[in-house]
């Protein structure tokens, strides 16, 4: 609305300042839109037609007309020969200056003042070149078009959780333009085809307000126009969203928008580090005490047993913590020596895939080791369950965790020397998390010193143990290869009718991939096993090399393709029914072994 002193409100210039002409302003504007003929001179002073006056005099500045401030854009005056169409569509409009005599000054159309430029940079031209207060309908549509132009939501993104949508809905502070942001981060979002959103409304005359607004904004802020050009560039199928670095990224939404990550598939398979023990790692020392005063023993809930004693559950009275108690009988001084060695080894093993020691108490007749309680049971007992669907990817998850635990042991210069399926427990009855237990036969390892042992379980013994040769960290890797073979096939590669035949099979390296059983097993899995069950220690893979093997990598991609159930699940069930390792730790006389295997060392099969 134009005031009496000529000031312009809302950035729109009024062409008439006379009080008498205000009443006819709306009628003239509507008539100008419908009929481009020049106004009737009898109605009073008004704008002159450029066709009738092709050589207007130089416009004179009015004292009351505010001069454009620095930074405002003043359009150049078009020449008479360049005028096209009626007034308001490229021609000049003249109006008498209030309080001045002589010929009225020619005012450039749509010349905004500094105040109007700051308030309304998106002001649009109507079809007649001006907006009169008598046209509320057109003004309302212009305001709606300006609001739509400011929103400018991308057309290709429709997911409410997509980070680009989140960014577009969060308006930036008006007092801090985009060009003043300290740093911009462009987030790439795949442009997926979808239904096109309706564009902003158009004003009368078919002028696209959004296009005009972007054009005017580009003239005022070239930097913003360049950024808008980058935003709209979808030539490569990627739309970029400019986001100030001060606002944190919505990482959760981004994970929903992007393709599934590898760890997402791990979560489905419970392939994440097992939960730590319910107590922090501690350095345990053997002490004398009264077990019943500190712990409530539950001997009826047996977890296992062997030659040295039994394992049951217990509860610490002061904290209510449930633990596993390994009771070892002190029959000879060597029994205590072996327990002290086990405590020393476990004090160094602080890893999620290795069982943790809580306390050790000595009584007159026995030693009790209190350890982390693992409720899932043995790995093989778990996978033979009829409700469990075993796939090769499941085996990869199990083997990878075993390799993680072995790698940590070997870094700490510890050899387990009794890796077998019953010494691998599941953390729970539903997931894929496992831990290695039973360090009763573990030994400290120094590569510069020779170490020989003559104990173990025949099926999982390496040739160097059977021959009583020097062992190394590769001795554990042989056992890992046998375990992997059994998980994939359900068969034991060296198992014979008796222990003697089993040990002969180990020494001769007499094993192969059963064609029918391994039909559905990948070549990568076979290669993994073939590089572990090798007679020469130096030719076997280390734990680090196993973790880098292709078979134990790219699990997410393999999980998408793997939907076949392994036959080993059925064969393992038959195997466990035939042979229970818990009751088959047999002490073997060296003299009986020498008769058939021609070995230079004695062999004993011990277990706890």
UniProtKB/Swiss-Prot annotation:
The modification Phosphoserine is found at residues 153, 159, 161. Gene3D superfamilies: Phosphorylase Kinase, domain 1, Transferase(Phosphotransferase) domain 1. InterPro entries: Kinase-like_dom_sf (IPR011009), MLCK2_STKc (IPR042717), Prot_kinase_dom (IPR000719), Protein_kinase_ATP_BS (IPR017441), Ser/Thr_kinase_AS (IPR008271). GO terms for cellular component: cytoplasm. Its EC number is 2.7.11.18. Residues 31-43, 50-63, 116-127 have a biased composition (Basic and acidic residues). PROSITE patterns: PROTEIN_KINASE_ATP (PS00107), PROTEIN_KINASE_DOM (PS50011), PROTEIN_KINASE_ST (PS00108). It catalyses: L-seryl-[myosin light chain] + ATP = O-phospho-L-seryl-[myosin light chain] + ADP + H(+); L-threonyl-[myosin light chain] + ATP = O-phospho-L-threonyl-[myosin light chain] + ADP + H(+). May interact with centrin. This is Myosin light chain kinase 2, skeletal/cardiac muscle. The gene is MYLK2.
